Regions:
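HhH-family (HhH-GPD) DNA N-glycosylase catalytic core used in base-excision repair
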Residues: 1-187
Length: 187
């Protein structure tokens, strides 16, 4: 993989074994919006990222190289050799063969612990669109404003300190339902 910086954008070329849509939409994270085909707004680590994939190139728009190196490289797990891992799994594990062949481009996102924990609690008996809506509502209501992309406002997932005084009733207003007491306990 080659990395360059062009007019305020980090550009990755010769990217192998990565599919942005598969990675974001497979159900491991919920704090993103699809903007266009293979283009997304992603909220993570108190940052807002517009990212697009074009074949074997990935563009991180309006991103400092330092943010790529300190946040996004690890978040998207670009440093791991997924081709080697897949080759090993295909040779040794028949059970995983179909999954590996079906989801060739999924990377394991290195997410913030607190957001992952709360999202996991929310995910009980929920479909992905509803989980995403609850995460978005919690972020709008209790998180910090991160900015705007294409006329849409985005908010960071709230921190533990931002959630420490949130009540079960507040959480139920965000449509968490029976999960509210578990979220309060987790905070």
């Amino acid at each position: 993989m080659q990395i360059s910086y062009d007019e305020g954008n980090v550009v990755l070329t010769e990217v192998r074994d990565f599919d942005l849509a598969q990675t974001l939409e497979c159900g491991q994270c919920f704090h993103f919006k699809k903007l266009a085909e293979q283009e997304y707004a992603v909220c993570a680590f108190h940052r807002l990222l517009r990212i697009r994939q074009e074949k074997d190139s990935v563009i991180l728009f309006d991103t400092a190289m330092q943010d790529y190196e300190m946040i996004w490289r690890d978040y998207f797990d670009f440093g791991r050799d997924y081709g080697r891992i897949k080759a090993a799994l295909l040779q040794t594990d028949d059970t995983l063969k179909e999954a590996v062949e079906t989801m060739q481009g999924v990377h394991i996102l290195q997410q913030e612990f607190f957001e992952t924990l709360i999202s996991f609690i929310i995910s009980q008996n929920k479909q992905i669109p509803h989980i995403k809506k609850i995460v978005e509502t919690l972020s709008e209501r209790f998180g910090d404003d991160l900015g705007e992309i294409n006329g849409m406002r985005f908010f960071a997932f709230p921190t533990v300190s931002q959630m420490c005084n949130v009540t079960e009733e507040d959480l139920r207003d965000c449509k968490t339902g029976f999960r509210a007491p578990y979220i309060v306990d987790a905070v």
